[in-house]
A protein has these predicted regions:
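Active-site Gly/Thr loop motif
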Residues: 245-246, 251, 297-345, 353
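Active-site helix/loop module of the DD-peptidase/beta-lactamase fold
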Residues: 132-170, 197-199, 224-263, 268
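A short acidic/small-residue loop/turn micro-motif
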Residues: 103-107, 111, 350-352
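Active-site SXXK
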Residues: 95, 113-138, 162, 218-222, ...
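Flexible glycine/proline-enriched surface loops and loop-helix/loop-strand junctions
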Residues: 107, 177, 199-204, 214-216, ...
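N-terminal leader/targeting segments and the immediately adjacent pre-domain N-terminus
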Residues: 2-106, 135, 201, 368-376
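Active-site-proximal alpha-helical segments within enzyme catalytic domains
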Residues: 214-221, 262-285, 332-348
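Short, small/polar residue-rich loop motifs at catalytic or cofactor-binding pockets
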Residues: 83-86, 110, 329-330
Length: 376
């Protein structure tokens, strides 16, 4: 009886501390991640969160390339995919599906978390909000939409500063620390309350500093400007018009708060997320219908404060080819090579993490394989 009483008291103390220290998010993280055998968030974790449905309309499949799946496999590449636990690898040339391969039990109907590819999607939504007149320009001040903005430089931050990751926001993007702000953003039940408490402490527009907080602030701007939820606005202006084969999901902090995790967590099939690549490759045109101004797309894939980042897109030059890339945690990629009219999509559970924010080596391995197949 005494032992049982002590156990109850200990549990009561633990839970009291959890609530007193606002660590409910930490408990949720342990339950979702560690108790499922993972050490970080993963591509199937959306099943443990509330999600907003992104409705499609008039779904259509990709046109198949005349050489669809007609290629000789490279054993070393297949071994690499096994090592990286790839779930899907697609190559699209001239808007036609050339290569489609799935691994580890995944198939063309499997939905997975694209993580920070969502940042590119939100950039599209931003461009549309500007085009529709809800936002004057990229140079408009953020404080006009969020008067409660905090920090020494709150009055100086422009929308472009958020979009190009140069806002001066106080932020720690490290996913290794379970008590960091980025860990909290993934598991808290009121994300925007947390975000709005983060201050802008450095001069904006001067230095590239990749931050999920920038994207979440941007989503608040867009929702206040348009009067619509991010998911609804994206569905109406893009997902339905791109004839996605499936409804998608966008992870929420909770149904009660209703805030999409704009910095991450757009969930779809590999073939459907590739449609974002097609829209960029064709400068905002979708099969003859313009979904967004071409000038915004062109501006998005030009280097800004950093030579590796535009507006929601990563940039590099490889083997003489200019490349724009959408990237997400654990190696989610939609890679665009305009000169080759090429889109490469890869989803999976691992990547070659070098601890840096720059483009990682594994993405070039997927590019090399696509170029090899095209040349043969």
């Amino acid at each position: 009886m005494r032992i049982a009483k002590n156990i109850i008291i200990t549990i009561a103390i633990i839970f009291s501390l959890i609530y007193a220290l606002n660590l409910e998010y930490f408990v949720k993280g342990v339950r979702v991640v560690y108790l499922n055998g993972y050490t970080t968030v993963y591509i199937d974790d959306y099943k443990y969160f509330d999600n907003e449905i992104i409705n499609t309309s008039n779904p259509k499949d990709w046109i198949l390339h005349t050489n669809y799946n007609n290629y000789k496999e490279d054993p070393s590449f297949e071994e690499f995919n096994s090592e990286m636990e790839t779930s899907a690898f697609l190559i699209i040339e001239n808007d036609s599906l050339l290569v489609e391969k799935y691994y580890d039990g995944y198939d063309d109907s499997s939905m997975t978390n694209s993580f920070s590819i969502s940042k590119t999607i939100l950039s599209l939504i931003l461009g549309k909000a500007i085009e529709d007149g809800f936002i004057k320009s990229l140079d408009q001040k953020v404080i006009e939409f969020i008067p409660e903005l905090k920090g020494k430089f709150a009055k100086d931050v422009r929308i472009i500063d958020l979009a190009q990751m140069s806002s001066g926001l106080k932020w720690n993007e490290s996913t290794l620390n379970p008590f960091s702000v980025i860990a909290k953003t993934y598991f808290v039940d009121d994300l925007n309350k947390l975000i709005l408490d983060q201050p802008f402490e450095k001069t904006p527009g001067k230095k590239f500093d990749y931050s999920s907080g920038n994207t979440q602030f941007l989503s608040i701007v867009i929702e206040r400007a348009t009067g619509k939820k991010i998911a609804e606005y994206f569905s109406e202006n893009f997902w339905q018009k791109m004839n996605a084969q499936n409804d998608a999901l966008w992870q929420l902090d909770s149904y009660e708060s209703g805030n999409v995790k704009a910095f991450c967590c757009f969930i779809s099939t590999a073939k459907d997320i590739s449609r974002i690549g097609k829209l960029y490759l064709n400068n905002g045109d979708w099969n003859g219908t313009r979904l967004i101004n071409s000038s915004f797309i062109e501006n998005s894939i030009k280097a800004k404060v950093s030579d590796i980042y535009g507006i929601g897109t990563w940039l590099t030059n490889y083997k003489g080819l200019d490349i724009a890339m959408m990237r997400g945690h654990l190696g989610q990629y939609v890679i665009i090579i305009p000169e080759k009219k090429l889109i490469i999509t890869r989803t999976g559970k691992k990547y070659m993490d070098n601890g840096a924010i720059e483009i990682t080596e594994d993405s070039f391995i997927y590019i090399d394989e696509a170029l090899r197949i095209l040349d043969n």
